[in-house]
Amino acid sequence: MQREKVAVIIGPTAVGKTKLSIDLAKALNGEIISGDSMQIYRTMDIGTAKVTKEEMDGIPHYMVDIKNPEESFSVAEFQERVRKHIREITERGKLPIIVGGTGLYIQSVLFDYQFTDDAGDAIYREQMEKLALERGVEYVHKKLQEVDPESAERIHANNVRRVIRALEIFHTSGEKMSDQLEKQENELLYDVSLIGLTMDREMLYDRINLRVDIMMDQGLLEEVEGLYNRGIRDCQSIQAIGYKEIYDYFEDRVSLEEAVSQLKTNSRRYAKRQLTWFRNKMDVTWFDVTDGEKTSEILRYIEGKLQLKSNNSK
């Protein structure tokens, strides 16, 4: 049975994935699936750098604005929804193009990841949640480092839910989450062209800093204030970079200037972690866009890899 063709564009935040994906979708008769775990949330537009209607330019986008901020969302649900979109887009004679920066989510779609339906150990989970509240997220993250350093490296301390899930897997099965994933990383389920964008680090960091300034000008403070005033607390959504820092400001833990500075720092660190993840976990063909766009070059590469003809070459 012939595998479905999928183009995937990955790279750190602010590197220019959105524009490239739309240009490629136009040329390759494609439709776009967001591979970002935070763009799924409604009303969280500015802080997630969500693609706008104007930017979409008529290209259908999926996995955007599908959940309310107070709702949780799992990798397993992402996997199920995206695979359904891939199937439906392919059936319409279009090319699915996955775009994003959340490595584990994208990887879970492309490879044969199995997610167990067992409830785990609710008592142990509650104990860990209590520890996180009483002794801090870093304490729980350190416990994960002791039993599963690879997962601890991959999962940020502030993502308490996933930290506790990894601990719970080890507690119930005696097996590391990282080992479980490693077993499932061998075979691609699709005929994939995996493209990565990179650029000079200083230039990327300058772009990230500028993006944060633009977000503030566009109304990020008001966007986060709206969530805060709705009473949204301790939710998966507000762990996102761009929200947790501004929440600290509304909780009077830092000044606005300090919050913005921390947002820039966290965004730069996240970009570095994204690049490390993709380079270590995926067989990516990288294109350096320091000196400008490489749209034509990338288009030719995808055409060759997936044996496609673009609208430009017809």
Swiss-Prot record:
Biological process according to GO: tRNA modification
Transmembrane intervals: none
UniProt superkingdom: Bacteria
Residues under site feature: Interaction with substrate tRNA: T102, R125
The organism of origin for this protein: Bacillus anthracis
Residue ranges of the region described as Interaction with substrate tRNA: 36-39
UniProt entry keywords in alphabetical sequence: ATP-binding, Magnesium, Nucleotide-binding, Transferase, tRNA processing
Cofactor: Mg(2+)
Taxonomic placement: Bacteria, Bacillati, Bacillota, Bacilli, Bacillales
EC number annotated for this UniProt entry: 2.5.1.75
Coiled-coil portions: none
GO terms for MF: ATP binding; tRNA dimethylallyltransferase activity
Family per record: Belongs to the IPP transferase family.
Record-given protein name: tRNA dimethylallyltransferase
Binding site for ATP: G11, P12, T13, A14, V15, G16, K17, T18
InterPro entries, per the entry: Dimethylallyltransferase (IPR039657), IPT (IPR018022), P-loop_NTPase (IPR027417)
Function according to Swiss-Prot or TrEMBL: Catalyzes the transfer of a dimethylallyl group onto the adenine at position 37 in tRNAs that read codons beginning with uridine, leading to the formation of N6-(dimethylallyl)adenosine (i(6)A).
Binding site for substrate: T13, A14, V15, G16, K17, T18
Subunit description: Monomer.
Top-rank EC class of the record's enzyme: transferase
Known catalytic reactions: adenosine(37) in tRNA + dimethylallyl diphosphate = N(6)-dimethylallyladenosine(37) in tRNA + diphosphate
